[in-house]
């Protein structure tokens, strides 16, 4: 029997539930399947275990945006910028700023005159 990657990550989490990297791997697979709600749940677990994991904030914002929660996406990216400031991850900070600015532009374009 061939196990799916989600099944593999889930089995790994049964053994190591506090491992942020495994949660991130699970979220990545959920993202690929466009399972936004489950991916968001997994990514929230990642950042609760490791609040400095900037890539998780980036993906969480993208997942929330894809799910139609632009305000939630923007907050995730702002939280990621704070994490990048704490850790000195300047490249991640630049990317998160770009995502935030892009979302702000999209949000403004959708507002009625």
Stretch-by-stretch model annotation:
Residues 11-12, 45-46, 80:
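Canonical positions in the second alpha-helix
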């Amino acid at each position: 029997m061939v196990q799916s990657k989600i099944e593999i990550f889930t089995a790994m989490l049964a053994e190591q539930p506090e491992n942020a990297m495994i949660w991130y791997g699970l979220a990545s697979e959920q993202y690929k399947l466009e399972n936004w709600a489950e991916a968001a749940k997994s990514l929230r677990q990642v950042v609760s275990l490791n609040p400095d994991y900037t890539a998780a904030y980036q993906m969480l914002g993208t997942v929330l945006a894809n799910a139609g929660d632009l305000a939630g996406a923007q907050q995730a990216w702002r939280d990621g910028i704070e994490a990048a400031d704490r850790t000195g991850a300047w490249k991640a900070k630049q990317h998160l700023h770009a995502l935030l600015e892009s979302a702000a532009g999209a949000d403004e374009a959708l507002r009625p005159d």
